[in-house]
Amino acid sequence: MDRETNVDSIRVLEEQIKEHERAIIKLKRARNSLLNVSTFPPEVLGNIFRWNVVLKDDFGGLEEGSHNFLLVCHHWFEVASRTPELWTFWGTSLEDWEKRYLRSSAGAPLDLVLDEVPYMFGFISESQQMVLKDHTTRDTLRRVHLRSDMHCLLTAIISPLISPYGGLQTNSLESFILSNQDHTPLDVSFFAQSRLSKLRHLELSGCTISSWDHLASQTTLLTTLKLFFPDISPVPTMPRLLSILASNPHLQNLELNANAIPDRDRDGSYQIPLRHLKELWLDGGAGQVFGLLRRLEYPQKMDKLSLGLSHCAVADISQTIGPYLRDYLRCRGRPRNGLGLVLSSGRYITFNVGDAGRPDPSNSAFSRMSLFMWVTVGMDRALSDDALDKLTLDLIAHTPREEIVYFRTCGSLEAVKDLDAQMPNLKALDLFRVPLSAVFPTLSQDGSRVHKRFPPSLQHLLIRRPNLTTNGWNPLITFLSHRSSSGNQLDSLLISGPCHMCSRVTQRVMDVVQKFEIDDECLESWCPFGNCLR
């Protein structure tokens, strides 16, 4: 064999070796991906699959480089099919759930988890009723999670689960979530006849309950209790509510709205120890909220304490809110992540603070406060701007201002006039329908006049519904530019709501802020960019 032939043969062999190496690399990547996927619990894999396929309307099929995604889906399907005792979420409709029931083992525990039940009619088929009755008879239901805006549909699904004696036909139920988003409240009196010895998670929203007695005698293992009742539901007495809490000493998450908190407390001589509590959320009048707080013995360092106060008046601020916050900070020390303060005027009752009155900022930077308080003033009366400003200033004056790291205001301008003095450690400012021309007035060339209003600690700015034209952004951009040039650039800016922001303005903002986000409503209306900003 001559020299040239040898060289050609060597080149061919080298090419084959390279091809095999590439194939081996692909095989190793596939193996490693599968090994990594196998380490995830099936619940996580199910959520990956659900968010990537089920919840995306624009899912157009797999693209190149989707091998890992296929492995995740395949592994999730194998786990779901072969080990129903580990993964028991079978779909988002009763049809999916019924099909899965027919293929699973008769004794395998199943979960009835139907989020936003997608039905146009308030009834279910006879075969679906049979499936539900069969599982309640076999006592194989571990979780029942139902959310719908149709009262009649929720009633139709729950009816097969109730025994002839009026209670739930299951002793194995560990979690029960019933969210009725219809205007007609859902009666859950069947709890009075139910045996709930294994129940750990109870969440009722948009429901009424005729008797509170049974919850204290039958629930002893609850770790999560969330009750959001409408106005027509009977409010428990303080002894009855405390009895329920005392029967469940391992509570970690407690959330109650005004119609689940007693109005009066005639005997405040003893406290209920809740030493495992991590998150406490209370919403109601100042007397209700602080009356219950005085009766709870909770850990010194909880993950989050959220207080919602409605119909707030000057007397409530000076006599109740301020003293409580000062005592809280004196006895428990500085909150882990500071104090978040939200102020909403009743003029914007259709836009309550967050969902159902809860602070729910869009940016994660606004949601890590360990002590969160939001106050709704003037809900039942029209307040003038001067009256609203007075309430706002009184609230700030009676609050330990050095602890406030998050502040949200809905309309009051006095609150943001001199933030560097009022809230020297403020990190996040949230403005809703506040005229930006008043917050960021016409500036001198270097922007120093408005710069003094905001403390150097400010890192995050959220502006909701600014309703501005292009030229209206100039004061804000000047402020941001001055902060950036002085070495104190904002970490994030979030614009939420319809606004006229052209590409030129968008680019100028992106140049002077580390992270810039615009919500979908604003993007669809005006912005030429898209998800590249996210």
Where are these regions (language model features)?
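Leucine-rich repeat
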Residues: 1-534
